[in-house]
Amino acid sequence: GKLDKNEINTFINLLIEARDQDRQIFIMGNGGSAATASHYCCDFNKGASYGYDKRFKFICLNDNVAGMMAYANDVSYDDVFVEQLKNFYQNGDIVIGISGSGNSKNVINAVEYAKSQGCKVIGITIGLTGFDGGKLRQMAKYSVNMNIDDMQISEDLHMMLDHLSMKVITNNMISETLAKAE
């Protein structure tokens, strides 16, 4: 597989834009992708925000286990993310779906909802996928596809993208701070 540098640069620039415009960034996944989504939330809300005036507003939709299980039990597991988005999504927010296969129904449903709420025009949907990207890659306005036919390596690459993005953004913020001080 090959990583597309333009997809990665676009991803990083969209995160910076969301931070600068005080937008929320919703992120979600299942299984290993859920752990990755939670890790992104931690890294950006603390690691790329603490001590800076401009702060990220990541919200991990798979971290509220009680809420997810209530929707899974009473509505459908396919709707555990979309129902949470209905409470919080605002035009201009970013929705990041992480799915190794690109075909996780509950992630797809959340991205479809975001697009139906104007995300296609104003907001952004980003799909982090593996293999051929599945349905998520086709429907997301932006995607970063880890084109490799191995779930664990795909998940590892999603985590590497987290750390790479965070380091690029924090290094830029340090450079900006130093330039202002001169």
Functional labels for PLM-detected ranges:
Residues 24-28, 91-102:
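A short, small-residue-rich loop immediately preceding and capping a beta-strand
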Residues 33-38, 103-110:
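Short glycine/serine/threonine-rich phosphate/pyrophosphate-binding segments
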